[in-house]
Amino acid sequence: MATSALSAATANLETTLITSGTPTDVYAELARRALHCWFGADGPLKATHVFYADAASPDQGGAADIVLHERDDGPSDRRGSRAFRITITREGGGVRVGITNLRMQEPMAGLMVQDAQAWARGEEACATRTLAQAAPRAQARLLGAPAKAAAGR
């Protein structure tokens, strides 16, 4: 499967923010929301990617990594290349959340960063769903479907 090159502006740059709470609480919230938004029943990444997370116990600082892998349907492990990473660590009196796009394509990558930032701040968000919902309408327009059918009426 060929993928187009990522722009230098979006690949492997880490977006960082400091938030309140504990690493364990921030990890639990980010993981819950990512699984619901990105991998839920109609999540845009459900068929193409695999969610993997590793978290230390709160007694050991609670640091955590969430890594999204490209889905590999080979005979063993379904985790292919790493595509997106969120790291969560204690920093000073807060929690450092680092968000790195490794292989996701735009505009999905930018929307995923927006989602993760919002979740780390305790906000509701699922911007990636708007892109996933817009795709069938755009495809219907390209195929010449009537406007009412494309709008889902």
Regions found by a protein language model. Give the residues of each.
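Ser/Thr-rich, low-complexity intrinsically disordered terminal regions
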Residues: 2-153
